[in-house]
Amino acid sequence: MNTTNAKKKGLSTETLVLSALMTSLVIVFQCLATYTTFFGPFSTAIGLIPIVIGAVLCGPVIGAWLGLVFGLVVMITGGANLFFAFNIIGTIITVVVKGSACGLVAGYVNQLLQKFNRTVAVIAAAIVCPIVNTGIFLLGCILFFMPYANEIANLLQLNVSGMAVFAALAFGNFLFEIGMNIVLSPIMVKIIEVAEKTFNRKGKKMAHAAQPVEAEAENSEENN
């Protein structure tokens, strides 16, 4: 095992640990969100916070995974029950795709911008995440639920029709979520900086500890 392989193994372990931690936080945060139904029948997506942090620290793929977990938690905790009553398949597709996509896009936005400025990259990822989440929700409503718009409006006692029904459902939560992410962005930056420094130190220690082992292995090969 050479130094490069050891380093790659260390980074892989770090990513695994961080993704497991962020997965746990997504589950906890979104379960807590069940009790934060401020606007309409939906809970607020506070699970987007660890999704952004995970996407920045671990990359777009882990961001997509965290978004998938977020979507599953939303469905399990009853956050999509209103739509399940009208179109089960459409609900599953919409919830899973919007969750995965918001984490994936947040990760790519961070990768694109971090070469210029880390703080700007994190803030941009935090803003893009709820935009993608809400945008795909509205797209899913158009594709799968437009025939039921008036029925949903009557059920929720909304004095609107057509696409305005779904816009009304999403608008309040969207403003809350994007505002929350913007306000918490500086905290996210600090958390990310601390996490990176911590794992960088551990990575250096692992690489340093591996050097004597590698030297001993090389000497053994030479003697043989």
List where the protein language model places each region:
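Alpha-helical transmembrane segments and their cytosolic interface
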Residues: 1-23, 156-224
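Hydrophobic transmembrane alpha-helices
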Residues: 1-65
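Alpha-helical transmembrane segments of multipass membrane proteins
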Residues: 26-30, 70, 74, 102, ...
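Membrane-water interface at transmembrane helix exits
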Residues: 29-30, 34, 106, 110, ...
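Interfacial aromatic-anchored transmembrane helix boundaries in multi-pass membrane proteins
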Residues: 30-44, 68-104, 108
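Juxtamembrane non-transmembrane "cap" segments at the membrane-aqueous interface
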Residues: 132-157
